[in-house]
UniProtKB/Swiss-Prot annotation:
Name of the featured protein: ATP-dependent dethiobiotin synthetase BioD
Organism: Burkholderia multivorans (strain ATCC 17616 / 249)
Binding site for Mg(2+): T19, D57, E118
Binding partners and assembly: Homodimer.
Keyword Magnesium belongs to the record: yes
Stated family: Belongs to the dethiobiotin synthetase family.
Top-level EC class as recorded in UniProt: ligase
Gene Ontology MF term list: ATP binding; dethiobiotin synthase activity; magnesium ion binding
PANTHER family: DETHIOBIOTIN SYNTHETASE
Length: 239
């Protein structure tokens, strides 16, 4: 039996399509014949339905996953207010504990062939007074997929984030160009610049370009991603 695969999805910023790309990856992995599950370990922003608190990002991941995890595994920390997690957690008297997330991830790996773990915000978002989401990625020990929101300023954000990932000793398995701004000028040139720099400095391939979609359609977006290459990279990282 093959060892389960997993990856950590981060982004250059918040609101750049991490959940959308994570959902596209889930669809792609399912088409590749893998039982794919998703985790959103920390989610800030909840709504109540039928007496149950839910999160829109987590709902989107569940809709795309071929293996739906129990809510307590998928999102061990669901915060009500849509703001910086460590601030909301303090107000809601919640301790965001990395060890708890690692334990949930270990359980999730027993239920699927691949687990997509979506971070919160950018790569370094505080979880408490001493730890951030980069520490979470290190604790999980996962290869990272970087979602770059293609808009003005994205080149610097992409290069800085890639450097931060490498500085933590993590593998940048690849990146996705997500065109969040349909009016962006020189989009092709921006993608080419990021592609060349990340390939040269981090050997990180461009996994795909996703055109601006309104409404977002992760199932269609999955067709633009090089899932086979990503799976090969993830398997190589296990050796």
């Amino acid at each position: 039996m093959s060892t389960p695969l997993s990856l950590f999805v981060t982004g250059t910023d918040t609101e750049i399509g991490k959940t959308f790309v994570s959902a596209a990856l889930l669809h792609g992995f399912a088409r590749h014949g893998l039982r794919a599950a998703a985790m959103k370990p920390v989610a800030a922003g909840a709504y109540e339905r039928d007496g149950v608190w839910r999160n829109e990002d987590a709902d989107q991941l569940d809709a795309a996953a071929s293996v739906v995890l129990p809510p307590e595994l998928r999102t061990p920390f669901l915060l009500k207010a849509p703001a910086a997690p460590h601030i909301v957690a303090a107000h809601e008297h919640v301790t965001l504990d990395i060890d708890t997330i690692v334990a949930c991830h270990r359980d999730a790996l027993t239920r699927a062939d691949i687990v997509v773990v979506e971070g919160v915000g950018g790569f370094r978002v505080p979880l408490n007074d001493t730890q951030d989401t980069a520490d979470l990625a290190v604790a999980l020990g996962l290869p990272v997929v970087l979602v770059v929101g293609m808009r003005l300023g994205c080149i610097s954000h992409a290069l800085l984030t890639a450097d931060a990932i490498a500085a933590r000793g993590l593998t940048l398995a690849g990146w996705v160009a997500n065109h969040v701004d349909p009016a962006m000028t020189y989009a092709d040139e921006n993608v080419a610049t990021i592609r060349d720099w990340l390939a040269r400095e981090h050997r990180a391939p461009l996994l795909g370009r996703i055109a601006h979609m309104a409404p977002a359609d992760p199932e269609s977006a999955a067709a633009t991603l090089d899932i086979a290459a990503l799976v090969d990279t993830l398997r190589a990282a296990q050796r």
